[in-house]
Amino acid sequence: MSVHELALQRSKYKHLTDDEWRWFLQQVEGRERTADKLPTFAAIEDWWYPVRLSCEQCSSELTARYKASLVSGEKMVDLTAGYGVDTYFLSEQFKKADYVEQNEELCRIAKHNFEFTIHNSQLKIHHATAEDYLSSLSGEVGRGLDLIFADPARRDNHGGKVFRLEDCTPNVVELLPTLLSHLTPKGRIMLKLSPMLDITQAVKELSAVSIQWSVYVVAVKNEVKEVLLLSRKSKDESQKTDITAIDLAEPEKAFIFTREEERNCALINGDATLNGGFLYEPNAAILKAGAYKLVAQRYGLQKLDVNTHLYVSDTLIENFPGRVWQINSQCTIHDAQGSQANVLCRNYPLTPEQLKKKLHLRDGGTAFVIGCRVNGKPTLFYAERV
């Protein structure tokens, strides 16, 4: 029975107070909504769930485990712990961990969940803001953190979305000197950012003489879920920011590069076969990371247009990190009318819905009609997925 169906059965649960009933529905809905997202928690019978928004905003188990694979040490703190998904999996890599959260209800839920399930018996719950927690640290203890993790809230006081790091809460740009002062010599800062934030601008805002940043653009099944910044201490100001674009559905195809490599990359010139050749679209992580030219160079592809992030080759490139089609033909509006096909538009004058309507296309099948610009000219391809 779904939570919506259950909500209509209030009369059968008269023994529950209104508060108990709301809590009961919250638990049913939380388990229902996160069963696939958080399978480890779903398998624990007495696991508690927070309100819907917290369940929606929390990391998935897959992305949380990936973050945990990047770090290890003696002690860590999660300054914006929320539901505690990242805290749970990150803490497995450390001997001691602090959970910091300003929402009292989330702290209550975390205390219950971590009390009997966490692998780390040294995890402590702190009901506090990030700023107050940091202010409470002092002496050698205050300089003993091997990891400071934060996922700054990306909404203002009125609930509106913000897109600059300095407008998020806590303001990690302002807090950066304080964060650095609490790290061990090999300690690191990890920030989880929105996919909507400008990566280059975020790194620039967090620039400091003593540290460099590694960037991780993390996608799952071609949807970017989060952008991670992980600090590394360095006095070499010439050291470049490395960027890893990874889709956790195909982690072996991770694409690692620097902005300088992309900037200095020259595109391949030539005349690839557009009929019978192969068409490529990099995965969402690579596109978000901005490796538009470098992906062409590394895989020996030709880019269709400076502003069209589609690529072609005469022969099939194996293990390409993204989608691949075989081009059956270029086609005109008249050629494509009335058939059944999936529609994709990239740098094309019409949206997929507009093109579909114009062509009188029915959804489905294995064929694709792909609209894009080739050397500035709107072009249609009729293709099949490889």
Model-identified regions with their sequence ranges:
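SAM-dependent transferase fold signal centered on methyltransferase-like domains
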Residues: M1-V386
